[in-house]
Amino acid sequence: TGLHKHAWPETFKFEEIRLKRYRMGRGNFLDHVDVGSYDSAMRFLVLFVYLNDVEEGGETEFPELDLTVTPKCGTMLLFPSTWTYLHRGNTPISNDKYILGSYLHYV
């Protein structure tokens, strides 16, 4: 049982935790991946914690996966930072969206 020895790095750490605000009617983040530098590709997981509910808009959308995550207070979203997880932050319509975000990366 457990993860294969090559499935999880022996040494890793979180980057600083960022508080992000997406403003109602104008805050968004266009399609991107979160590997950081393509030369080093140190990041391997993305971590978001939604700090409030957004009734309309504000979703985190993965267009290539046909997946949309609606912001709900206290929900955590964890996904790989690589090119296969292209995503975007849609503009919140009903109210501002607040998230905590960080990345796990290799040391």
Task: Name these PLM-found stretches.
Residues T1-M76, T84-V107:
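Fe(II)/2-oxoglutarate oxygenase catalytic core
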